[in-house]
Amino acid sequence: MNKRVLKFLCLGLILPVMTAGMVSCKSAGSKSGADGEIHLAIVDDIVSMDAHKTSNDYIVPMNVFDSLFSIKKNPDGTTEIVNSLADSYTVSDDGLVYKFTLKDGIVFSDGTPLKADDVKFTFERILTLPDSAQTDFVIAIDGAEELLNGQATELRGITVEDDLHFTITLAEPFSGFIAQLATPSTVIYSRKIVTEAGNDFGTVPEKTIGTGPYIVTAWNRGSSLSFEYNTRYWGEEPSVKKVEIKVMDASSMNMAFQKGDLDILDCLFLDSAIVDSTYKNGAYKDSLVSVDRLGTNYFLLNENIEPLTDVKVRKAIQLSIDRDSILQSVYGGDGKLEDGIYPSGCLGYSQANQGWLKRDTQEAKKLLKEAGYENGFDMEISVDAGAADAINNSIQIIAENLKEVGINANIKSYDHASWLDLRNSGKMPSFVALWILDFNDPDNIIYTFFGSVDNTVSRSDNYGDTATIARVADARKIVNTDERMAEYAALEKKLVQDDAVWVPLYSLKHTYVKGSRVKNFTPHWAGWSDIYFSGVELF
């Protein structure tokens, strides 16, 4: 799935690195927290309220709709999948057949009952909607490929028994399937509501109706969004009853917070020096909320472009980068070094694959000499013109590090559309980016980048070992969890340590500052900037 840095730092997302974000704000003259109202701000307006039409804008899907499952983060940092719209499910021994029961009595905010047929409708819509952004999340279902390619008119892998019971059959075993059903990419829509709304669904608030804790009451494009509590909501009543979101630049958010007009400040969009001096070491230090972001920053190399075709050259690049210097100087040390593909906290994270990568410029020079590049070479690092300052600063340090071993890294900027086109074409020489998990499973990262030849091209790594690509694809079919995680660890070692197609950098913390009206705030489990309004508890 194409991931973002665009509007919000979400899901698993790849974040090519654009400035964006969300901050809660309470403007002067707004109602007090006792009234259950908060004001929020976003840097860029959303493009659509329809989850099927975006891989960036999840603030509406997360709060207006529900998925069959959700993800809960435990105090020890682990996560678990819990039931949401689904009341229960079973899986066959061969890992192919999933039988589901929906919770009884759930209705959409207009009173329309939730039915099992709505699940089938939703997943068929994901596969048939032109330019759908979420096909990856249901492609494992039997018949999905045929429906996607126009070779079928319905999804044969879903059978509806009655209003509360349905069965999903997969084309082949995939142990990460339930985790995919716990994402905002797979929120459930009503066949009746969407059909009657037509093109107004996802664009007109009163026609964009879900089962979640909030309803959209207004969307003034480019300006604001308004939400109110859904009195028909089936779950626990939230503390926040009304939400007003304004489009506002990050600098204004910071100023507003310091004036006392903000409820929550997302430090992601501030310079680390400001965060350190004003918030971490200032009067707000007791109001910080930090979570480990389940995401990884990485430097990806294109194996189709000389001399990156040579594994010794790629290993030399791995050894040249002073990752700790970047982490300290750019991010204020607010994170940890990662030596593999999967970030800390990800299911399948292998401690055995950590600790091997240390900066060694002499060894890097030796490898370059063995590869025939004793005098170095020129290469390009491609950067999105809308990249955040932190990304630009990181790339600058990487270029300086490479220069120390004789590699002249030219940093070339592209507008966002051109950057994406170049990467998707498989012709981007190298780039630095961030991937944040959509769902907590190693498949979310490794399959996206290395699960097929097409995937390796669209990510511009052009990894050429077809046997390893086949292993990545086959790993998702392993039913035994321990065996599957062992294979993912072995694949991580092969890709990063042996073949050096991936240069691991670091994972970061995501830090927020609570305003005086906020009693508790639970960030998204993966550290997205998108927040669940119900995760905010007011005094």
Feature annotation, model-predicted:
Residues K336-E370, A385-N393:
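Structural transition elements
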Residues K115-T122, D163-T169, G212-P213, V240-K242, ...:
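Alpha-helical secondary-structure segments
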Residues A41-D93, I209-G210:
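N-terminal lobe/hinge region of extracytoplasmic solute-binding protein
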Residues D87-T135, T167, A256, P307-T309:
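Aromatic- and charge-enriched surface segment that lines or borders ligand/interaction sites
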Residues K73-D76, T153, D163, L170-P238, ...:
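Gly/Pro-rich hinge or "lid" segments in bacterial periplasmic/extracellular proteins
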Residues N230-D276, N408:
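Ligand-site clamp/hinge motif
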Residues M1-I38, M49, K358, E537-F539:
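Short, low-complexity disordered leader/linker segments with a strong preference
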Residues N220, Q318-G348, A390-I397, L422-F539:
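Detector for C-terminal structural segments
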